[in-house]
């Protein structure tokens, strides 16, 4: 397999093993599409032994919050996050979907109390493969692209 050459970042976060074509959604949910979003390096549709094809996002000078990592897990459940300091990976971990997701998604049910009252949307994970979530308030289930569309 040919060597992948992507510039090394001095400080920041590398998100690897994103399914091919999902990099744009990742940078949108992280707010990196704005002019002051930070320096990005993106490798799209690159060969991967694990996924066949994958995307990689490098964010210079920025580290992710737990909520941001949880959002990434909903889009790319097999993603790996690398924390880089002084050009070296100092921490590496796989994202994981928490058992309960609070305040990240909106419920697609227009009649759900979470869309009308001051309560944080809350979802329980019913299954991880395929990913299926159930709203705590109205019991509506969502899965697949509907989850991504409600981030």
UniProtKB/Swiss-Prot annotation:
Keywords: Metal-binding, Pyrimidine biosynthesis, Zinc. One of its GO terms (cellular component) is aspartate carbamoyltransferase complex. One of its GO terms (molecular function) is metal ion binding. One of its GO terms (biological process) is 'de novo' pyrimidine nucleobase biosynthetic process. Zn(2+) binds at residues 107, 112, 135, 138. Binds 1 zinc ion per subunit. It comes from the Archaea. Pfam families: PyrI (PF01948), PyrI_C (PF02748). Its cofactor is Zn(2+). Transmembrane segments: none annotated. PANTHER family: ASPARTATE CARBAMOYLTRANSFERASE REGULATORY CHAIN. Contains catalytic and regulatory chains. Involved in allosteric regulation of aspartate carbamoyltransferase. This is Aspartate carbamoyltransferase regulatory chain. It comes from Thermococcus gammatolerans (strain DSM 15229 / JCM 11827 / EJ3). The gene is pyrI.
């Amino acid at each position: 397999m040919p060597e992948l050459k992507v510039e090394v970042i001095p400080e920041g976060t590398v998100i690897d093993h994103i399914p091919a074509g999902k990099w744009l959604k990742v940078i949108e949910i992280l707010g990196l599409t704005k002019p002051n979003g930070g320096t990005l390096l993106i490798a799209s549709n690159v060969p991967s032994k694990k996924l066949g094809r994958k995307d990689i996002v490098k964010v210079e000078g920025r580290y992710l919050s737990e909520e941001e990592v949880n959002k990434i897990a909903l889009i790319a459940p097999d993603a790996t996050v690398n924390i880089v300091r002084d050009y070296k990976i100092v921490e590496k971990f796989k994202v994981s979907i928490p058992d309960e997701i609070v305040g990240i998604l909106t419920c697609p049910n227009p009649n759900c109390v979470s869309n009308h009252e001051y309560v944080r949307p809350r979802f329980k994970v019913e299954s991880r493969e395929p990913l299926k979530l159930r709203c705590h308030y109205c019991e509506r289930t969502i899965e697949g692209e509907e989850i991504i569309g409600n981030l």
